């Protein structure tokens, strides 16, 4: 006769797991009923701020303290003058774009927060999935659909983090080229173009963050009964 298979935990370990579960359920309840509505309102207000409603993108440009070289010598200049080495002006400290950096300081924590909240929701729902057995699995299918959507949101938020990292890399490359090839004005223009593009990306991120929170609120609240009680059993509160 086959022996029953299961995970055996000591009494203390079982208590610790149960404490974790209860804390998880409380965090999920706090997230749904208080955090989500407040965050949607906050992001909606943030999108009304002047810093995220700049009409003239040229006003975002940061000064580039990169010397512009003298024009090349004339062809009739003496050969000895042509061979004479002129001192190359070296660029000093080149700061980032303060206006873009201030927006990054505002948006980046919001991106991290949504990613962590997605992980919270995923963990919460996973702990609500019942034992796999024959019977009515309609509620479980709903849980899986919600998990699928939350994971999709998390993936998009992770792409935001990549976009933020790429901004520094791409702008740094443009500044390096502008400081090395000081006679090429297009490299200077490239720096400004990258800053303007970053502003548009950051505003779009805030719009998406608000939309993602609204979507999470809608999909969870609309399916809450099946999420917390997939088998239709009597269970108190959200757990």
Swiss-Prot record:
Q: Which GO terms describe its molecular function?
A: endopeptidase activator activity; identical protein binding
**Superkingdom as given in the UniProt entry:** Eukaryota
Give UniProt keywords alphabetically: Acetylation, Phosphoprotein, Proteasome
- Positions of post-translational N-acetylalanine modification: 2
Q: Which residues carry this modification: Phosphoserine?
A: 10
Disulphides: none
Q: Which residues cross the membrane?
A: none
Task: Give the UniProt entry's GO cellular component terms.
Answer: cytoplasm; cytosol; extracellular exosome; membrane; nucleoplasm; proteasome activator complex; proteasome complex
Cited Pfam families:
PA28_C, PA28_N
Q: What induces it?
A: By IFNG/IFN-gamma.
Which GO BP terms sit in this record? regulation of G1/S transition of mitotic cell cycle; regulation of proteasomal protein catabolic process
What is stated as this protein's family in its record?
Answer: Belongs to the PA28 family.
Its job: Implicated in immunoproteasome assembly and required for efficient antigen processing. The PA28 activator complex enhances the generation of class I binding peptides by altering the cleavage pattern of the proteasome.
Q: How is this protein organized at the quaternary level?
A: Heterodimer of PSME1 and PSME2, which forms a hexameric ring.
Record-given protein name: Proteasome activator complex subunit 2
Q: What's the name of its gene?
A: PSME2
